[in-house]
């Protein structure tokens, strides 16, 4: 499983990271993946809602905007994309 994480400001990628695990993607562990990604990018972890998981499952990507974060975020959005091999 690979997830491409991008921090975007004004439509431009400011920072990116590819999160890799040998295990299969399981949606019950999605918050763990999100926490690991945010720790690696040195940003706060956003609030994860059911709609975020549904969007990731249906469209293979999810976008977290500044209102999804409790703490302030220096970027416009965190965009996670499932890399399908």
PLM regions and their residue ranges:
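Acidic, low-complexity intrinsically disordered segments
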Residues: 33-85
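Short, extreme N-terminal segment that most often corresponds to the first beta-strand
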Residues: 1-18
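Short, flexible N-terminal segments of the mature chain
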Residues: 13-40
């Amino acid at each position: 499983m690979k997830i491409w994480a991008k921090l975007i400001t004004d439509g431009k990628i400011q920072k990116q990271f590819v999160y890799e695990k040998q295990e299969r993607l399981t949606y019950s562990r999605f918050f763990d993946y999100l926490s690991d990604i945010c720790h690696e990018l040195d940003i706060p972890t956003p609030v994860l809602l059911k709609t975020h998981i549904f969007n990731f499952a249906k469209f293979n990507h999810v976008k977290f905007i500044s209102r999804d974060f409790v703490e302030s975020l220096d970027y416009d959005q965190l965009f996670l994309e499932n890399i399908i091999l």
